[in-house]
Amino acid sequence: MEPFLRRRLAFLSFFWDKIWPAGGEPDHGTPGSLDPNTDPVPTLPAEPCSPFPQLFLALYDFTARCGGELSVRRGDRLCALEEGGGYIFARRLSGQPSAGLVPITHVAKASPETLSDQPWYFSGVSRTQAQQLLLSPPNEPGAFLIRPSESSLGGYSLSVRAQAKVCHYRVSMAADGSLYLQKGRLFPGLEELLTYYKANWKLIQNPLLQPCMPQKAPRQDVWERPHSEFALGRKLGEGYFGEVWEGLWLGSLPVAIKVIKSANMKLTDLAKEIQTLKGLRHERLIRLHAVCSGGEPVYIVTELMRKGNLQAFLGTPEGRALRLPPLLGFACQVAEGMSYLEEQRVVHRDLAARNVLVDDGLACKVADFGLARLLKDDIYSPSSSSKIPVKWTAPEAANYRVFSQKSDVWSFGVLLHEVFTYGQCPYEGMTNHETLQQIMRGYRLPRPAACPAEVYVLMLECWRSSPEERPSFATLREKLHAIHRCHP
């Protein structure tokens, strides 16, 4: 065995001399040992394939089959001195130090990130940054860290706080992969090196008391995403707040993207309103996915409802073919969503069929809750534009801007009228001014032909002049469900 290995792997003569010193007995083989006549022996190139030594990590257990191989266990750290022929010649850094050949299929290169689970290792930190960290609260004298060396590729440095200054020590690597601060004191790894100098700190004149505490990074809002993650596709519509587009998130997830019109919005209040939206969770509310508010235009990204808004859907052939049960189903679902907002003390301010979205299976969800509060005062005014939703707005809100859950109840009554007229515009033929005048004189929308009498009674209750006399959404929800059960 010895002559064969010395002849085939002559460049490892220093290693063979350790195994078979001069005058030693030759190895005539042991039971189960590698037979050079029957088993292939790796042939390593004369020149290394890459700069060595390199760090490897054992992926699987391997049991040596001859004296030239190295037994390793999964997780062992290895320092590879040579590589080739499907093997590495490596020194084990953990456990009992020894060296030998290990199949390359059983190991993987270990980058410095392998140390990232250690509290004292700071990847990507420069010498200057290490000083800033160690001298910043809550760190005190004795705080230390290991970082990649700036002057030695693949090497490390030890930085230690000593009162009001920071001392830096180069961690050198010996030819066999051992690490040291001082020649003559070799360690198989960084952990062993630190353990030694914690106990013998006087050798470097600075105690190693505790790992450096990283400064807390600013808390990142997981909802906030860059514009680059979203691609606009088909334009779905346009409203008071901006345009609505069908789009893709990260190239795969279909979403609805509301592009906010900054000219009409009080963007200074947008962050606060979005915080409210993030905390609302109900199956009858449109689900918020993400926000892009780091620059203009602002995106509000929500789930995509395939059939669009309820007002437009009711005017399609599919919508006009619906009979009483699904229409009552729409009313019940909207009442459920609004009852939840009522419990959360959130005022919608712009409840209408156009702000209810429909998906496959005729599931519907309330959208745009709370955004009307962000419209600039000169935009949200009954006299400013015929586009403003005065016909859906309670008189106290239209005249005096007094919004409440009860003004939402008024709007819900108008939404019910839309549902049972298959999306027709309420107060058709009247201007905003005429509508308000007629309402103040006591006029109320007539009962639609498709509307049950008991539902129309609820509409009239929603349109009571005194807000306090209007029903709650919880009451409306229960009454509508009872009516729905009578019309299965």
UniProtKB/Swiss-Prot annotation:
Disulphide bridges: none
CDD domains: PTKc_Srm_Brk, SH3_Srms
Domain SH2: 120-212
Catalytic residues as annotated in Swiss-Prot or TrEMBL: 350
Domain Protein kinase: 230-488
Catalytic activity entry: L-tyrosyl-[protein] + ATP = O-phospho-L-tyrosyl-[protein] + ADP + H(+)
Subunit composition and interactions: Interacts (via the SH2 and SH3 domains) with DOK1. Interacts with KHDRBS1/SAM68 and VIM.
Protein name per the record: Tyrosine-protein kinase Srms
Species this protein is from: Homo sapiens
Name of the encoding gene: SRMS
